[in-house]
Amino acid sequence: MLKRIVQAFFIIFGGVVGIFLIPELFVLLNIQDIPLITNAYTSAAIGAIIFFLISIWGTEYVVNWVKWIEDSLLKAPVPDLLFGSLGLVFGLIIAYLIVNVIPLDNIPYRIFSTIIPVFLAFFLGYLGFQVGFKKKDELISLFSISARMQKKKGTADEEHEVQDKKLKILDTSVIIDGRIADICQTGFLEGVIVIPQFVLEELQHIADSSDVLKRNRGRRGLDILNRIQKELDIEVEIYEGDFEDIQEVDSKLVKLAKLTSGVVVTNDFNLNKVCELQKVAVLNINDLANAVKPVVLPGEEMNVQVIKDGKEHNQGVAYLDDGTMIVVEEGRNYIGKHIDVLVTSVLQTAAGRMIFAKPKLLEKAL
């Protein structure tokens, strides 16, 4: 059936071409004065016959080419075709607008005024198709998130509340850490929790590691995500998109946060700094943990157990129950003992808190 359609197209096309070109051929052959030959019907018939003969050789190639295109389109996923076509249409519209803005009539050579529109249509159409095809995952995710946010809007107060609850994008370190599940359970973290697909893939790689410690950490992270999804009353979204031009997961998180105006949730000190430099909102759960620790002021007294040497000469190291490190000056001689110390200073950073103290017995001796 397709073969006959192609042959019919060749014949019709040949007839049309014959009407316009065969009379010119008759003029060159100097037989334009013969009425029986030089008429539209004869010209159309000659053109149709010529293209019919061409179709005997060329039909198979055309049919095979059409079938190849058909098979390729049928095998392609619907989102690929949809967003590729949208990108193509958008590119052609841009090309049309540009052609109408540029005064092509002022171009000195006529051939350029003819070629430029064709080139722009081809180039921008191809570019639009490629962008729509390769960015389909990101566009789908953004549209789904946008649609979900629109459904939640009602009154003006509700709209303001939804805008305040930005998307919380989790990174790998905060998932493995595990405290994020408890924070979500207490209700301190509002809004929608977004877990990017590339973070899940990184967790999967860690869980499949040959190193026992890494494997346990990866499996713990997957268990934490399972708990957040199934046990906690909080909305969780999986972001299916990816940024193929970016290799690092941290850089992908920053890019996603920029696209969605979301907040990166992490306990990675370096990622925290990168987000600040990129003007991306970030929540560091170490900052939250430090904020809820008991406040310790210089001059306060506490009882600690010195457990090991410090980095400097005669220093000892102790820890509070919450894991805060205490550096005890002249504390090396008290390793393994419980002693009373006086706080001399407190160093607070995004990575944690460190307390400097000295033995109370030493203070009394002075």
Curated annotation (Swiss-Prot):
Induction trigger: Transcribed under partial control of SigM ECF sigma factor.
InterPro entries according to UniProt: Nucleic_acid_metab_PIN/TRAM, PIN-like_dom_sf, PIN_dom, TRAM_dom
GO molecular function: metal ion binding; nuclease activity
PROSITE patterns, alphabetized: TRAM
The name this protein goes by in its record: Uncharacterized PIN and TRAM-domain containing protein YacL
EC number: 3.1.-.-
Function: An RNase.
Domain PINc: 169-280
Lineage: superkingdom: Bacteria
SUPFAM superfamilies, A to Z: PIN domain-like
Domain TRAM: 295-356
Name of the gene encoding the protein in the UniProt record: yacL
Cystine bridges: none
Keyword terms: Hydrolase, Magnesium, Metal-binding, Nuclease
Family note: Belongs to the ycf81 family. In the central section; belongs to the PINc/VapC protein family.
Record: residues binding Mg(2+): 250
Co-factor(s): Mg(2+)
Family annotation (Pfam families): PIN (PF01850)
